[in-house]
Structures are given as C-alpha cells and as structure tokens.
Amino acid sequence: MIDREVLLRVTQRCEELRIRLVLDECFIEFLPVPERYSMLRETERYHRLFILRAFTKIYAMPGLRLGYGLSSDDELLEKMQHMRQPWSVSVPAQEAGIAALDEDEYIR
C-alpha cells in the first residue's frame, strides 16, 4: 500500500499539473483499517481525483461485475453518463448490490 501522505502529495501535484489521477480502491476493504489509506474523503478537495470501488471483491460476487467511480468533477461525470450503455448494470447485479448493502456483518 502507498502511504496516505505520499498519495496526498501525488494528488496535489496532479491537481497543479491538471492531470487526472485514477485510484483503484477495489481491494481497500480487505485492509485492517481501510480509512487509513483511502482517498475517498479527498474527492471534494481534489477535482481531478477519480476513485474506483467494486462490490465484486469484498462481497464475493465477481461474475456480476458491479463497481462504481467517485469524483467531484461534475463535467467528467456528465460526460461519462452520456457515454454509458443504457443497460450498463444487469438486473441480477443490481439486486445483489442492494442486498449486499444490508450485509454489514459479512464485511466484519
């Protein structure tokens, strides 16, 4: 894992240089203290930061392909919305994702 302070410096530098930084946090929930490494709270502060997360890893449902991205860049999110397929998430994946959100005990 990359130290959070290093990530903050990299994120700041990317912001200064107008470079989009994409961080894959799909496995972060497997860490003992995920909050220590996550940059999720920094998306409001850093406009060019984009974070990837997935249900498929932590909830053990890899065949369903359910993930999401987080960013405070409304322009980017709007462009992504216009480019996506209307059926980008299958009904079984949607149902499994909704059910997974109620499984706090499984995550612990």
Regions found by a protein language model. Give the residues of each.
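Active-site pre-lysine segment of PLP-dependent enzymes
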Residues: 1-21, 25-58
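PLP-dependent aminotransferase class I/II
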Residues: 48-108
